[in-house]
């Protein structure tokens, strides 16, 4: 069956309701202290899901925020991995620039200010298909088992590959792609991290099913589970996607792949 209005489809709408709750609660004065923070980059009031942790108090509020949303939705609200990615990439890019004189940290700060100012949902994309897990990325029979650079240009890079099980990817405005394992020098083309808009040319999302998702469509008085809220995942495929230099945060500095993962 071809779905023309997927936004309101009963198997898909619940996941949209979940991420919408991260915006609704941030507008509620009752939850302002948990759901919002002051940006360390601009001094502006921002959604805590876009915040760089500055203290142990920030970390406690992060957990309390997640508990609150769990109570409100009883499901996945889809912005947690993106939030963790912000903090991991922020610190990692600083270390890379210190060693190599690159400009990844400034790239990332400019991107994050844009995310904060517009309260964007960003998917943290880390899990590659992997193929034969006994082999390194460069040893795979299919090179696209891990996201990798296939072309380097003066103005950016072209990437191919995929990321699996991307919760909330279809509801995200942007993706941050990161390595999924530590890598050696032979894998330097796979040591790549970047931001990419969801509607980029060459980016495809194959929507996945949820366990018991058809219960939300059944009639009668039988239990339909969590009817208003739910999850969704997608396989995100990159088919020769161009990434401009300003959105690149790692490009061949293989020894830092594990740093981002950690």
Positions of predicted regions on the chain:
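A generic secondary-structure signal for well-formed alpha-helical elements
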Residues: 23, 27, 115, 119, ...
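FAD-binding core of flavoproteins
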Residues: 124, 129-262
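Acidic/polar, glycine-rich intrinsically disordered N-terminal extensions of enzymes
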Residues: 1-39
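Hydrophobic alpha-helical scaffolding
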Residues: 5, 101, 224-227
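Generic structural signal for well-ordered, non-transmembrane alpha-helical segments
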Residues: 10-13, 17, 113-116, 158
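Terminal targeting/low-complexity segments that flank the catalytic cores of oxidoreductases
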Residues: 10, 38-44, 231, 235
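Internal helix-loop-helix
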Residues: 24-122
